[in-house]
């Protein structure tokens, strides 16, 4: 199959947002917009120093083989979208949702696609849910490794479940309480071990995220939804995804037996094998991930026709 990969832009706050359009040359085809997860994750699914799984690039390439185009993007203020805003940290989660609207419009204008699906991975799932509230042009949602509970309870459970966190647990829970109440925490009050999670420059974004209940957002959504969850995900457990389906029983759910959080094939319960997958771009996506997304997009696109 002949494919085309090109740079694509969408209007940003003052400067442009940039991404990569990968498409099979098959005429009118569905397009999937891939919304990245948290932090400095780039359009390919990588981040400096620790995350080199190339999940979004691999997903785009596999979807292209299935006759589905994709756009994978850099967030405002980062990488190719660095000129979109002066400070990449000066954002709230609704800003990313607004960028999804801009991307959907740009994709439709560039490709003429009759259906644009929004795939949100991890934190990107929350962004996708927020964007879908106000966009008639989004055909449906694909929520991948996306938590179905508010972030506060998820973080508390993660902190409390690890005995190694005992020395910093009280400080962490106190910080969370303050942020949920809308109060910033100064650096002097944050244990150095916790600083990467609660940096003062990130707190505005974190506070915006803590206010959102993803299951409540999905409960009101009437378009097609696919929930993709890996059984070997160390960051978003299966029980974290289940509230999404309970909130919207019409949503489809694909449980992928060997997929971890970055959708890589992890054959055992070994922690080191799982973590090693985060830095291995040569490791394939887990069986069933692309198949589930492709089947959902094609079937739902036919139903829209």
Predicted segments, located by residue:
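N-terminal cap/lid segment of alpha/beta-hydrolase-fold proteins
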Residues: 1-27
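Short, surface-exposed "cap/lid" segments of acyl-processing enzymes
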Residues: 27, 32-62
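Conserved alpha/beta-hydrolase
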Residues: 54-82
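Alpha/beta-hydrolase active-site loop
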Residues: 88-109
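Accessory cap/linker subdomain of secreted extracellular hydrolases
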Residues: 142-208, 212-215
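Catalytic active-site module of serine/aspartate enzymes centered on a nucleophile-bearing elbow/loop
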Residues: 259-263, 267-305
